[in-house]
Amino acid sequence: MKVLGIIPARYASSRFPGKPLIDLKGKSMIQRVYEGAKKSTRISEVIVATDDQRIFDEVQRFGGKVMMTKESHPSGTDRCAEVASHFPDMEVVINIQGDEPLVDFRQLEQLIDAFIEPKTDIATLGNLSLTQEDVDNPNRIKVVVNAKNSALYFSRSAIPNSHHSKGNPLENYPYMRHIGLYAYRSSVLQELTKLEPTALEKIESLEQLRWLYHGYSIQLVETTIETPNIDVPEDVEKVLEFL
């Protein structure tokens, strides 16, 4: 199976501008993400996709592969699709978030394994090691799944809501945190970019809700590997503890 790893990276993040270029103990965040992805021997090619010259120059500086993309892309998925269109021989594309400096190659290979099943369109990761603070934090995305581990819904809110339950909600239900790494069959990735945005996607600010709304299945792969991401400046200190 030929697998393309793409790291979409933009400078103008609303919550943390310039995030890909922050220094994490001597290396930029984008370099740490790239190097983590390159550790997998099952990914044929790893490429950073950006529309910013500063990020482009940084990737070239540390010797990584990078492609400049259109500025008009509304999401990282669209940016990935543009790059993937140049690699028609790739069967699976992994969207490796540029804010995951601790990405573990074993997580990526768990996603690849999901495509052994011919019916898998999209796969993503989740883990069950949430704290109550995580459950209440809108920057920690929660997901609920069905009996076959396909996603039913993603939310920034605590789902399911436990207002009728007594005691600690975490003792009553195995809350799952979504880890924002995605893999797609190449043909499906190109289809996703043609879908119309939906009200659910807009109100939650979660593009994967568009795919669910339009009938695509998202397979959740449970991982026990802990990889804190950097969504806002306050997350940096937590990541530095792991380096």
What does each model-identified segment do?
Residues 50-51, 103, 184, 231:
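A conserved hydrophobic position in a structured secondary element of the catalytic/binding core
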Residues 104-195:
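Conserved core of the sugar-phosphate nucleotidyltransferase
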Residues 47, 53-96, 100-113:
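Short phosphate-binding loop-to-helix
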Residues 170-243:
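Conserved alpha/beta core of the MobA/IspD/sugar-nucleotide pyrophosphorylase nucleotidyltransferase superfamily
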Residues 43, 89-90, 117-121, 216:
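Short, high-confidence coil segments that cap the C-terminus of an alpha-helix
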Residues 2-49:
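N-terminal glycine-rich phosphate-binding loop and ensuing alpha1 helix
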